[in-house]
Curated annotation (Swiss-Prot):
Gene3D superfamilies: PurM-like C-terminal domain (3.90.650.10), PurM-like, N-terminal domain (3.30.1330.10)
Top-level taxon: Bacteria
Organism lineage string: Bacteria, Bacillati, Bacillota, Clostridia, Eubacteriales
One of the Pfam families matching this protein, by short name: AIRS
Function field: Synthesizes selenophosphate from selenide and ATP.
GO molecular function: ATP binding; magnesium ion binding; selenide, water dikinase activity
Site (Important for catalytic activity): K16
Enzyme Commission numbers on file: 2.7.9.3
Protein name as annotated: Selenide, water dikinase
Reactions this protein catalyses: hydrogenselenide + ATP + H2O = selenophosphate + AMP + phosphate + 2 H(+)
Tagged with keyword Transport: no
Positions annotated as active site in the UniProt record: C13
Quaternary state and interactors: Homodimer.
Length: 340
């Protein structure tokens, strides 16, 4: 079998259409009105939320991509964890999922079985049910899930409702995109790959469960648009988010790779999108790249009231030891993001 990495031009969330291009396309779509639709695509949120009754709403999301690793079972786990993450980012719990499969006709079908087995493992871990799916032949393998979850409509974690005085908690380290780029170039150290794979395979379920014990004003997961673009979405039009680059958790080797200008195309698209929205000033170039790096199955970014942020951080660190306070929310300034 030709290797996954050699058969794919890109992989993971680095394959996403850039945020600038995507927003242009979506702006041409009609606005759908339904009083039961609590969250739609107009907010660029992580999932759709549709109210069923006073106490129940359905969370719906879909995510798929090409492989970023050679091991098909690990790829399946990562893709499933990434798809499930959107439900956790909304404050919900996954109920069931459908497989989405694109697979080359000439490739070994046993490897597809391994991909699906890896995805099923993560669904079982999440307590969700696999109900079926859809498959087609394609030139490159692709896998993901359409996931349905539930939540209380009074407890939705939206991505753009932070409040001045909040502190920001990031639950996973940055840098997996850069490490995967190094892996493709056969330059990655084993420890870096191990750290990246462990992070991408880990469900955001555990951080979300800890966070539910605290008032969460806003939440999103960090994926292909990188920390800065997702933070820009969180700031919305009424607040500014101040980030502390020196406090960021990241995979150590990713900093070194960025220092050597081992970059990703998606990261540079993210940089272009952020032009005029942030001033890097004297922020070291490697930290800039880590904030722009496309994450696959990245961590949650939680906006928590300042008076309980430290307590929330300690609780989340029981599940995610590398979680860190990385910023704060202030009233709107000239730019949506400031670096301090």
């Amino acid at each position: 079998m030709k290797s996954f990495l050699s058969s794919c031009t890109t992989g993971g969330c680095g394959a996403k259409i850039g945020p600038g291009e995507l927003s242009k396309v979506l702006s041409g779509l009609p606005v759908f009105q339904d009083p039961q639709l609590l969250v739609g695509f107009d907010a660029s949120d992580d999932a759709a939320v549709y109210q069923i009754n006073e106490d129940t709403a359905i969370v719906s999301t879909v995510d798929f991509f090409t492989p970023m690793v050679e091991d098909p079972r690990i790829f399946g786990r990562i893709a499933a964890a990434n798809a499930l993450s959107d439900v956790y980012a909304m404050g919900g719990s996954p109920l069931f999922a459908l497989n989405l499969v694109c697979y080359p006709e000439r490739e070994d079908i046993q490897d597809l079985g391994e991909i699906l087995a890896g995805g099923a493992e993560k669904l079982q871990e999440a307590g969700a049910v696999l109900c079926g799916g859809h498959s087609i032949y394609d030139r490159e393998p692709k896998y993901g899930l359409a996931v349905t979850g539930r939540l209380n409509p009074r407890q939705i974690w939206k991505n753009n409702t932070p409040q001045p005085g909040d502190r920001l908690i990031l639950t996973k380290p940055l840098g997996v995109g850069i490490v995967m780029a190094a892996l493709r170039g056969e330059m990655a150290e084993a420890a870096a790959v191990e750290a990246a794979l462990a992070s991408m395979q880990r469900l955001n379920k555990y951080a979300a469960e800890k966070a539910r014990d605290f008032p969460i004003h806003a939440c999103t997961d960090i994926t292909g648009f990188g920390l800065l673009a997702h933070t820009r979405e969180m700031a919305g039009g009424s607040t500014t988010i101040v980030l502390y680059p020196s406090a960021l958790p990241y995979i150590a080797q990713a900093y070194t790779y960025a220092q050597g200008y081992l970059l990703t195309a998606a990261g540079q698209r993210n940089r272009n999108f952020m032009e005029g929205a942030v001033e890097f000033g004297d922020t070291p170039f490697p930290l800039q790249e880590l904030m722009l790096d496309p994450q696959t199955s990245g961590g949650l970014l939680l906006s928590v009231p300042g008076d309980c942020a430290q307590e929330a951080l300690r609780a989340i660190q029981e599940a995610e030891p590398q979680a860190a306070l990385i910023g704060e929310v202030v009233s709107r300034q000239a730019l949506p993001i400031l670096l301090r």
